Amino acid sequence: MNKAERYSHLLAPIRIAGHTYRSRVVSAPWGGIWNEDPECHDADPEQLAEIDLRAGGGQAAFLVGETPVTAAGGRGANEFYGFDDQSEEHTRRYRQFAQRIHDNGALALVELCHVGQAKSEIEGEEQPIGPMELTNGDGVFIRAMTEEDVEQLCADFVKAARFCQEAGFDGVCLHCGHGWLFHQFLSPRTNQRIDRFGGSLENRSRLSVMVLQALREACGREFILECRVSGSEHVPGGYSLEDICGYCRYLSQYADLIHVSAGLYQDPSGTWQESTLYEPHGCNADVAAAIRAAVDIPVAVVGGINSPEQAEELIAQGKCDLVVLCRQLTADPFFTQKVREGRPEEIRRCLRCMRCFPGPFEEAWAELNGQFPEGCSINPCADHPERWRVEPAEEKKTVLIVGGGVAGLQAAVTARDRGHEVVLLEKSGQLGGILNFSVHDPDKNDLAGFARAMEAQARAKGADLRLNTVLTGERLADIRPDEVILAIGSHPLQPPIPGLDGANVVLAMDAYAPDARLGHKVVVLGGGLVGCETAVHLWKQGHEVELVEMREELAPDAYRLHKRRLRELIAQHVKTHMGARCLAVTEAGVQVEGPDGSVQLIPADTVVAALGMRANDTGELEALVQRAGVPCHKIGDCVRARKIYDAVSEGYLSALSL
């Protein structure tokens, strides 16, 4: 059996509403159809380039993301393109999207939504509507929907769907989850109506069913109607598994496909709308399986799926018919193509680090002062479509890379893509650098997997990878490189704290090792990202953990939603000492000075130091290379200790510059 045959279920086509899905992998709702120039009716070139990746990478269908059916149906301003004008000029952008998706071999759908009571108040727009009259969390007054509003809503969705159909789309996805309007009617938390739209499950499902029926009658049998639901709300008072299964049975009267997600937009990490690395992969699969058993139409599932092995297993076991990928396609848009070509080991599997998704736009914009992190930690081309064009080098060179962490490996892969000869020297017996600790943390297996994927790519492309090898003058003369790239990483910072070199002190990265000799009671010094993650790991391993941090904020260097989840776990399971300074480490524990100047001893069997990282000194190597008259470049943590994103990006860009 070859590698592709191992994924026979994942790669099998499926017929839905008269259309053939070429595989069982679907690109989750992504982006939207917009152009910042209101006078321009052409599609944004960067969005079209993203389609080439997400649809062209072998996925069966591409869903254009949340598209409000009216101006009042969008969360904020400028989200509504307008479906009243059916002119060629006005539909051109949609036609270009549909055509580009089809050109890449995928089916084209648009996700239609109405946010209901989650609406932000926009001057000049209609009064927001919802199941109940209330004032929402943003202070916006919400008007309870009337029968006339329901009729208008059906008409609005029909108009939008027909617009998409005329533009060449194969179907629409009705967004019935994540706390938007149809979800608000379904949930007993948000719907206490006493008319035919409230009370029983049938009544709470009625609005969704009415809209679906109207869409089916208007668009015909061969127009795909997909419904995206939150399989669970993951909040107190939310609907039950029995409720969501019953709801999906009602939807299946007119829908062709149920798409199972989870949670609420307002709290995406806490409710599993966007699972963090602390939730299981395929976190919605069991709910999807229950729904699949309750309906007689195909079921798709999204939620932390980043491996073809799990995707194949879910389909083979009958838990779902299709898998939906979002962040994974940001990490590697060629997921399906690599599986089909028998290269699954080269897939860059999403870390769920939350770099690419900071959370609810309005909150994140305010908290981050509009400075959203760009791109993906492990894909240097994400958010940079122009970077995918790797041109062959005009002059083929021999490139020597010193250091086999992810910066060096990425440089090796990209240099080989450009046609250079690559020799990589790694002084240890293993590639992956600082990420190798993660193989011992069940929550971080994807980090270790990324290092292995990078190694597999480098080997597949023909890089000469030499382990247990250091750079010497003799070796430099033997290799005769035209360019040298130094990627020798960083090391743990150890400030001059008395006792920090004691036998009861362990460095954070070493604390993950199976042979680490840790006592039951552990104090972690340092509440940055590394310290917080280590504290959570040790708690999960059964230790009693306390954490000491000089600042008043935990994990300020973590990405926003990952930071939120970390803080939740620490608040529940780790005792913290904030604004506290470590004075000394003794055999009995840690002596700290609190923010009020008081001094106390925190008892500890073991002290774990997570006090930052410092760039390794490249001076001797630079001098060696310079004496040979060879151009020398530095990338990654040996420039300055930072994040995986920086290492991968610099590795990629350095190879492009050669």
Predicted regions and their residues:
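Flavin-dependent oxidoreductase catalytic cores
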Residues: 1-402, 406, 410-417, 422, ...
